Amino acid sequence: KGVVFTVLALLVHAALADAPSFDDVKSRWVSTEGILLDRHGAPIHELRVIEQGRRLEWTQLSDISPAALATIVRAEDKRFYRHDGVDWLAMSDAALDTLLFSHPRGASTISMQVASHLNAALRPTRQKRTASQKWDQISAARELEKSWSKKQILETYLNLSTFRGELQGLGAASRALFGKDPSGLDQPESLLLAVLLRGPNAKSAGVARRACQLAADMKAEVACVQLQRLALSALPAAPNIAPRVALAPHVARALLSPNRPRVKTTLDAELQAYATQLLQQQLAALGGSHVADAAALVLDNRSGEVLAYVGNAGSSTSAIYVDGVRAPRQAGSTLKPFLYELAIERRLITAASLIDDSPVNLITPSGLYVPQNYDRDFKGLVSARTALSSSLNVPAVRTLMLVGAEAFVERLQVLGFDEVIHDGDFYGFSLA
């Protein structure tokens, strides 16, 4: 018999020898959320990049409210700080309940549950563990307590446990269900989270009922009706984590991925927010004209760095999928600066040169072309500087006639406008 027990002990020890350290577990933790940073390192957009599960950054015990810690420990393992991994008294009570009253209930400690999280072989199949699994779980929990501190065990438990649906970890559950970080959890919220650990997908009425019982056991001054209301409002069918910052959805979708969950950009968060606000205000002013989309790209002229990238400031549900910065469309006034630059470079005009902004009729192969300004008004003689800053169309057409369409096309191609593939005659006055 002694030989048999020795062999069993050696087998158990060999199985547990590969148990990871706390630092290993923490280092392997991967959030499902990507984060886009601006040029100063400030978060500018959060985006889910992994579809399996829902996890946030690892939550430390110091970042969890005292109410949440005390409530969860009381609900899950009230003698957690006094046992060596196994609560033999709780196991005896559970065995008696099963034997005498046929009311099976669990007696797994937090340490035992962490051991199961770390070793798939210890997890139950079809809601039940075999006797050998239970024994291995007990042995694993006791071994875990020899190398891990209580704080490390509790911290790991609160990060690896599933609370609701796909929400793994207290950080994800707190944000999704209550819209706050774990440091701000109050007593009623902590009661709901504590009972969710044993029934993550229970209906709100059942969760509220068990939370009410837990409050009574703890002598917590929380009314049952308050817990019922909180459960109804906080436990939707499909809980979701709202991003804390969402200023650059199009850039985030282009740059963030499971392999690149954290990317620093040249964007400036303040300028990005300001550009978005300006576009939204302009869209609101143009609401009567049925204008629903607007985009903006702001570059640093000296370095070429992108400082703001608003792909679409529209409010429609499809706006985040339509990137107006990249979408092919008419050039509008975006080519005018290059046109005037070429004219000045060739000494055809200066910034102070006067250009006639008056009606003009131009003959083209497709018929008569009569350029108009945006406001349908003409300003008369204006400087090239004013014509460009006011985005006047007629002076731009007159400048194009000075430069020549073919020369301007060649300049655009040199500058990297790869979409300009035809000769000057093909584009004609539309280049201005």
What are the residue ranges of the model-derived segments?
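N-terminal type II signal-anchor transmembrane helix
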Residues: 1-39, 79, 235
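Non-catalytic, structured segments within soluble enzyme domains
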Residues: 14, 103, 107-273, 410-413, ...
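Extracytoplasmic
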Residues: 29-34, 39-44, 54-56, 64-70, ...
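Short pre-catalytic segments that frame enzyme active sites
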Residues: 42-57, 168, 172, 253-259, ...
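Acidic helix-start/capping segments at beta-turn-to-alpha-helix junctions
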Residues: 64-67, 83-101, 135, 225-242, ...
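A short alpha-helix/helix-coil micro-patch that ends at or immediately precedes a cysteine
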Residues: 67-76, 213-221
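Short beta-strands and strand-coil junctions in structured, solvent-facing domains, enriched
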Residues: 78-82, 101, 200-202, 285
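Conserved catalytic neighborhood of penicillin-recognizing serine enzymes
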Residues: 97-124, 239-241, 246, 349-408, ...
